Amino acid sequence: LFSEIVRRRSARITGGQDGELDMNGTPREVLGKLGLNMLRFITRADSLSFHRVMVAEAVRVPELGRIFYAQGPGRVYGGLANYLGCATRRGELSCPKPELAAKLFLGAIVANNQLLGLVAPGFEPFKGKKMRAHVEEAVELFLARYGPSQ
């Protein structure tokens, strides 16, 4: 049951049916949608509360932490790495190490936004235009490094 709850929560981030990314979308579209969904999701009050509980309980119940990672963040990283590999094979990107590229992109999205929400009482996450601007900048940064070879 716990595994299914976490899997469904991670599906909200990818935004696709059953949590799958649009494997035929352009990198800019897929990364932009994923980035915005992720940033919105991880800065929500309920997501921050859930994350706090997971960090606290994973020490006491390691299996809970493993399930959380596998069905949550690990699933999102894996789905993105799979997409990046496909886009590279189509010539839309140049990602020799899709797993690393996925972690770097999602790290740029998360930045310090989740940490602020976790430890700063009353933190008000940025919304709207500022959130979109953050995601667009992360996408531009990613494409500058991993865009197709010229």
Which residue stretches match the model-derived regions?
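Short beta-strand "wing" residues that participate in macromolecule-binding interfaces
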Residues: C95
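C-terminal peripheral helix-coil segments that are non-catalytic and often amphipathic
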Residues: K33, N37, G74, G78, ...
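Amphipathic alpha-helical packing segments from all-alpha helical-bundle domains
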Residues: E29, R40-S49, V53-V55, E63-R89, ...
